[in-house]
């Protein structure tokens, strides 16, 4: 299946008035996770642009450490995803606690980069954009268009880069399973 790049959303959609932002319900982790995944899919190109701008600024100031940090993060993430597919304990951790899994990847990357002395570049160039994405995705309420786009991605009508990353973290399967359960209930 072809991978489609999601469109760049309008700035007033990405950052509307304060009425479209709300604190997530921390007691209902699955609902919060659903909001984050939905927003990551819907605003993925906006997140990529913001992260690219931040990475470019930090990379301009310290190019070697930025390239080193990027390589380490990609290698550690790939290694953890590979290990999680081959070890059941890691697979369960990744599926049940995706945020913890990403934090472990970031901490492992941090310790590897600290051996080379580029920790501040790592913090501001790589981790800070990820933190901003997570905060925005957690606080931004979804609209109808967002929900529709996510359903299309969930049932396989569209395939995007963020969808591939979320599949690697096993965050898409749950939504597809819920959708198929709903469809089978409707048929009955």
Curated annotation (Swiss-Prot):
The chain crosses the membrane at residues 36-56, 57-77, 94-114, 115-135. Keywords: Acetylation, Cell membrane, Cytoplasm, Cytoskeleton, Endoplasmic reticulum, Membrane, Transmembrane, Transmembrane helix. It is found in: Endoplasmic reticulum membrane; Cell membrane; Cytoplasm; Cytoplasm, Cytoskeleton. PANTHER family: PRA1 FAMILY PROTEIN 3, PRA1 PROTEIN. This is PRA1 family protein 3. GO terms for cellular component: cytoskeleton; endoplasmic reticulum membrane; plasma membrane. The modification N-acetylmethionine is found at residue 1. It comes from Macaca fascicularis. InterPro entries: Prenylated_rab_accept_PRA1. Its main location: endoplasmic reticulum. The keyword Isomerase does not apply. Residues 1-35, 78-93, 136-188 are cytoplasmic. Regulates intracellular concentrations of taurine and glutamate. Negatively modulates SLC1A1/EAAC1 glutamate transport activity by decreasing its affinity for glutamate in a PKC activity-dependent manner. Plays a role in the retention of SLC1A1/EAAC1 in the endoplasmic reticulum. The gene is ARL6IP5. Residues 103-117 are annotated as: Required for homodimer formation and heterodimer formation with ARL6IP1. Belongs to the PRA1 family. Residues 136-188 are annotated as: Targeting to endoplasmic reticulum membrane. It comes from the Eukaryota. GO terms for biological process: negative regulation of L-glutamate import across plasma membrane. Homodimer. Heterodimer with ARL6IP1. Forms multimers. Interacts with ARL6. Interacts with prenylated RAB1A and RAB3A. Interacts with SLC1A1/EAAC1. Interacts with RTN2 (via first transmembrane domain). Does not interact with VAMP1, VAMP2 or VAMP3. Signal peptide: none annotated. It is a multi-pass membrane protein.
């Amino acid at each position: 299946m072809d991978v489609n790049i999601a469109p760049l959303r309008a700035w007033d959609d990405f950052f509307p008035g304060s009425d479209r932002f709300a604190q997530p319900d921390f007691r209902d982790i699955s609902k919060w996770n659903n909001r984050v995944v939905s927003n990551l899919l819907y605003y993925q190109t906006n997140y990529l642009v913001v992260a690219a701008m931040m990475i470019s600024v930090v990379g301009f100031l310290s190019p070697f450490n930025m390239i080193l940090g990027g390589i380490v993060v990609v290698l550690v993430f790939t290694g953890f995803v590979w290990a999680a597919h081959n070890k059941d304990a890691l697979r369960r951790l990744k599926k049940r606690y995706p945020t913890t899994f990403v934090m472990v990847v970031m901490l492992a990357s941090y310790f590897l980069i600290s051996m080379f002395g580029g920790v501040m570049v790592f913090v501001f160039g790589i981790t800070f954009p990820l933190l901003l994405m997570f905060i925005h995705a957690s606080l931004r309420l979804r609209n109808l268009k967002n929900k529709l786009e996510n359903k299309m991605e969930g049932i396989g009508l569209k395939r995007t880069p963020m969808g591939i990353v979320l599949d690697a973290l096993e965050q898409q399967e749950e939504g597809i399973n819920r959708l198929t359960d709903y469809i089978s209930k409707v048929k009955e």
